[in-house]
């Protein structure tokens, strides 16, 4: 069994801070659950370009308001109680309005813990996941 508190994770290397957001990565690849679980805060009045080419993500808004705009598609409001699922590697813009948004996020494959979006909004794929994908394609 694994038991962790948000506060102890926040005070450790599991907290990753970027320009527009911070993420407390409570469950990671090395926990061997097959997914990772994060509490992510999107800072107020920000817009972040994201394109998870290598990961699927489900996001539940716990507090705050904003919107998600799918590139070339629709814009959806986000408020407490909203769940959105990026099941098509959707390129998108995530915007927080006048208050920060606090989100519970689940990633598959799981993150290792130190990922930050690259210039195209992508998290890199872990080397072992890349090898696994290559074997599946054969």
Swiss-Prot record:
EC number: 4.2.1.108
Pfam families the UniProt entry points to: Ectoine_synth
Pathway recorded for this protein: Amine and polyamine biosynthesis; ectoine biosynthesis; L-ectoine from L-aspartate 4-semialdehyde: step 3/3
Coiled-coil blocks: none
GO molecular function: ectoine synthase activity
Protein name: L-ectoine synthase
Described function: Catalyzes the circularization of gamma-N-acetyl-alpha,gamma-diaminobutyric acid (ADABA) to ectoine (1,4,5,6-tetrahydro-2-methyl-4-pyrimidine carboxylic acid), which is an excellent osmoprotectant.
Keywords: Lyase
CDD domains: cupin_EctC
Reactions that this protein is recorded to catalyse: (2S)-4-acetamido-2-aminobutanoate = L-ectoine + H2O
């Amino acid at each position: 069994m694994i038991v962790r508190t948000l506060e102890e994770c926040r005070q450790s290397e599991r907290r990753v801070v970027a320009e527009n957001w911070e993420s407390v990565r409570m469950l990671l690849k090395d926990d061997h659950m097959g997914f990772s679980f994060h509490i992510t805060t999107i800072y107020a009045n920000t817009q972040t370009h994201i394109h998870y080419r290598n990961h699927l993500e489900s996001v539940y808004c716990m507090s705050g308001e904003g919107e998600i705009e799918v590139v070339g598609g629709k814009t959806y409001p986000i408020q407490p109680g909203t769940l959105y699922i990026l099941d098509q590697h959707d390129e998108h813009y995530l915007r927080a309005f006048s208050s920060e948004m606090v989100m519970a996020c689940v990633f598959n494959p799981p993150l290792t813990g130190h990922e930050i979006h690259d210039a195209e909004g992508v998290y890199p794929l872990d080397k072992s996941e890349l090898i696994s994908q290559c074997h599946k394609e054969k």
